């Protein structure tokens, strides 16, 4: 299983879509607070449909609580990847492993410098885009990376028809 980490997500439908994605892929979802919405927001529920009960979701009070609660230190910190337009390697250049953490920033501002500055360059990855593009929608970005990582892991746990 892999882990999706949303750092202070702001837009309920994006998070709802990602909940549904995690429920359908078996990925763990981590939400780092504060959230830009309440947990009972109808837009969150509508986007996630009835998948909330099938997704494995953990909420963390802040970034440091996330690191501590998940034991993301030392060697395991090397398996935390930050998706950022400031990254160099493409998301598809990473050799993903079970247990990896894929962290995405808030929709309007991306990951803060105090997170990115403490990560080595090879852990700051990006999704290729055209030169004049600013960013992609959060839920679309998560889906792109999730399916690349899952593909590399042989779609572990998926029902595949031969």
UniProtKB/Swiss-Prot annotation:
Keyword tRNA processing found: yes
MF (Gene Ontology): RNA binding; tRNA (5-carboxymethylaminomethyluridine(34)-2'-O)-methyltransferase activity; tRNA (cytidine(34)-2'-O)-methyltransferase activity
GO biological process per UniProt: wobble position cytosine ribose methylation; wobble position uridine ribose methylation
Subcellular location: Cytoplasm
Keywords assigned by UniProt, alphabetized: Cytoplasm, Methyltransferase, S-adenosyl-L-methionine, Transferase, tRNA processing
Record field: catalytic activity: cytidine(34) in tRNA + S-adenosyl-L-methionine = 2'-O-methylcytidine(34) in tRNA + S-adenosyl-L-homocysteine + H(+); 5-carboxymethylaminomethyluridine(34) in tRNA(Leu) + S-adenosyl-L-methionine = 5-carboxymethylaminomethyl-2'-O-methyluridine(34) in tRNA(Leu) + S-adenosyl-L-homocysteine + H(+)
EC number assigned by the record: 2.1.1.207
Keyword Cell membrane carried by entry: no
Main location: cytoplasm
Role played: Methylates the ribose at the nucleotide 34 wobble position in the two leucyl isoacceptors tRNA(Leu)(CmAA) and tRNA(Leu)(cmnm5UmAA). Catalyzes the methyl transfer from S-adenosyl-L-methionine to the 2'-OH of the wobble nucleotide.
Similarity annotation: Belongs to the class IV-like SAM-binding methyltransferase superfamily. RNA methyltransferase TrmH family. TrmL subfamily.
Matches recorded under PANTHER family: TRNA (CYTIDINE(34)-2'-O)-METHYLTRANSFERASE (PTHR42971:SF1)
Quaternary context: Homodimer.
Protein name: tRNA (cytidine(34)-2'-O)-methyltransferase
